[in-house]
Amino acid sequence: MQTLKVDLGERSYPIHIGEGLLDQPELLAPHIHGRQVAIISNETVAPLYLERLTRSLAQFSVVSVVLPDGEAFKNWETLQLIFDGLLTARHDRRTTVIALGGGVIGDMAGFAAACYQRGVDFIQIPTTLLSQVDSSVGGKTGINHPLGKNMVGAFYQPNVVLIDTASLKTLPARELSAGLAEVIKYGLICDEPFLTWLEDNVDALRALDQTALTYAIERSCAAKAAVVGADEKETGVRATLNLGHTFGHAIETHMGYGVWLHGEAVAAGTVMALEMSARLGWISEQERDRGIRLFQRAGLPVIPPEEMTEADFLEHMAIDKKVIDGRLRLVLLRRMGEAVVTDDYPKEVLQATLGADYRALAQLKG
């Protein structure tokens, strides 16, 4: 087992990474301060792991709330089901909410914990690669709004993150690839040697090689923890973690939540960010193509939805958390391994990026 730390002073917390950690309740017990525990899961994950986790927490009074699965249910109506479960079970301020599932469950359970009786303890047990390397670390919680993704939420840090890599053995291949989009992101924004490692090991990752997966998760979480420790509330460097997300969130919102997986939209959105970075002369076309090839090898889409027009993108991108005083800030690559957040770009370059021939780029070999 590997343990990392998110350093936030008195609110610091550990990230435990290893195989079989669901069967080690001693990793969770120190972070549960009352008798009551509420496990929040979904209809896909609960049959696989809920009973096992409940057994390992036998010393506590455990209730569970099982939600419908999917991004389409990340909304007010589903959030109310969590509050209904907590109130029906008469859970008080010393309850601990545990998220058992992927990013949607983690975001909603965390937001519920932030709101319930003005804040209760919260634990993350992510079961998808995407949630293990990204959404479970850093305290971003929330729900979607019909007009924009993740526009309603709070920063609310967990007490501990428990990553059992064995849970990836039950993850569908499409979901695994979606998680690889966020892994690749770390190489692009801050760790070019990791990007090279990913190029050498992407096939092993897709084949569920436990050694490769554990290393990729550790390196991704270490990068995320360092950024969050330096900028918890995303006022500066943390925004670079959103590479591809402004374009990607536009895709998710326009196509309908859940039609494209988050990681799939991030992959296509990152290709657009690479294209814009190349058009600005910050990276070469060869470097852009390097990123595209890696996403393709990871089984991810690199062509945005062809039915989306430039106007569609601009409409959705105008409702983005990085918009400040009406200016759209974008995360782009100054070079491979170095990202910047900027609103200093010619409008014509953004327009050309939105209108680029991504189908032609996807055919490039090298």
Curated annotation (Swiss-Prot):
The lineage of its organism: Bacteria, Pseudomonadati, Pseudomonadota, Gammaproteobacteria, Pseudomonadales. This is 3-dehydroquinate synthase. The keyword Transcription does not apply. GO terms for molecular function: 3-dehydroquinate synthase activity; metal ion binding; nucleotide binding. Its EC number is 4.2.3.4. GO terms for biological process: amino acid biosynthetic process; aromatic amino acid family biosynthetic process; chorismate biosynthetic process. Pathway: Metabolic intermediate biosynthesis; chorismate biosynthesis; chorismate from D-erythrose 4-phosphate and phosphoenolpyruvate: step 2/7. Its cofactor is Co(2+); Zn(2+); NAD(+). It is found in: Cytoplasm. Zn(2+) binds at E182, H245, H262. Binds 1 divalent metal cation per subunit. Can use either Co(2+) or Zn(2+). Catalyzes the conversion of 3-deoxy-D-arabino-heptulosonate 7-phosphate (DAHP) to dehydroquinate (DHQ). NAD(+) binds at residues 69-74, 103-107, 127-128, 140, 149. The keyword Nucleotide-binding applies. GO terms for cellular component: cytoplasm. Transmembrane segments: none annotated. Belongs to the sugar phosphate cyclases superfamily. Dehydroquinate synthase family.
